[in-house]
């Protein structure tokens, strides 16, 4: 091994790969008539790691032991509470999709079509989390796109091919990996056309975007600028085939239940008519009856609906489900805050009544599971601010009064209880 420090009388040595001298690098390792520096070794290690990761993804999607629908469902259960029917639908759809990719090279008379997925459910019901968990389970590139930021090509805003650009960025521009990834398009309901009749006016963020998404979802060669640059003439583009990318579209579809109810519960006229209350059925139950015609009436174009054949509906989360979400999943919020407080060598206790108060508040705000963190963060703000400078605190207790804003956390100083903020 040659050290970079040497006397002037010694012959100057150079790296055989990058050409740097022994004085420009930390170490120069000698072989038979060849030298390699520490920087080139690091670069080689990085290349090997990347290729091993790519091979691992390829193997995970082509191996015979692809997770079964039941195994996929079991893993989803660890992260997502409730939504049993939606998890079953997703497990089968994703299993069939990657099973189809395994058999692409086999010549057969029967060609298997791609089954993209549409998730319908209220805010905070777990749509995004389901898609994220699936991507993590399958170890494939994943990207979330917001449909409300998309516009038709030529207008100010993001065009649909930016979605593929983000997917490429997430896998270091490895095209083969990107072509087997998962794209989640959120707020798909926000780009519905304003009426169920085709408009004669330009709708740059509605029907026009749906038409542009249609090509991407069904499979096309997307042209993406290299390394995230903007498109301009005389530029080489990266070509990405979207045929085998799994697209999952999600949205709250507020008002869709009324469209379904109007179709399914036609009311009669006269004394013999059956009068049904539209409040008799839960919104989640109503959404299960969704048909393509309802989505068309809501404002999605028929062609796009046809490219999203798998429809899974998610129900509104009740108080019991929200309480479970707080404590049961692997990355449950309460477990996260326990860990944060443990870093300060303090035990955190959130009492069951406090969890119930958090769930009730989230229901009142109509934010679902998404609003749970902000409620807990607000309740713990003062104590998290003061705790790092406090001495001798061993435990913090949170009850329902803290969540409702009527009290402060109880601090345990060795054997003496004390209220936060009191002197």
Swiss-Prot record:
Transmembrane segments: none annotated. One of its GO terms (molecular function) is ATP binding. InterPro entries: AAA+_ATPase, ATP-dep_Clp_protease_ClpX, ATPase_AAA_core, Clp_ATPase_C, Clp_protease_ATP-bd_su_ClpX, ClpX_bact, P-loop_NTPase, Znf_CppX_C4. PROSITE patterns: CLPX_ZB (PS51902). Keywords: ATP-binding, Chaperone, Metal-binding, Nucleotide-binding, Zinc. Residues 3-56 form the ClpX-type ZB domain. ATP binds at residues 122-129. Zn(2+) binds at residues 15, 18, 37, 40. Pfam families: AAA_2 (PF07724), ClpB_D2-small (PF10431), zf-C4_ClpX (PF06689). Gene3D superfamilies: 1.10.8.60, ClpX chaperone, C4-type zinc finger domain, P-loop containing nucleotide triphosphate hydrolases. It comes from the Bacteria. GO terms for cellular component: HslUV protease complex. GO terms for biological process: cell division; proteolysis involved in protein catabolic process. Component of the ClpX-ClpP complex. Forms a hexameric ring that, in the presence of ATP, binds to fourteen ClpP subunits assembled into a disk-like structure with a central cavity, resembling the structure of eukaryotic proteasomes. Belongs to the ClpX chaperone family. ATP-dependent specificity component of the Clp protease. It directs the protease to specific substrates. Can perform chaperone functions in the absence of ClpP. This is ATP-dependent Clp protease ATP-binding subunit ClpX. It comes from Burkholderia multivorans (strain ATCC 17616 / 249).
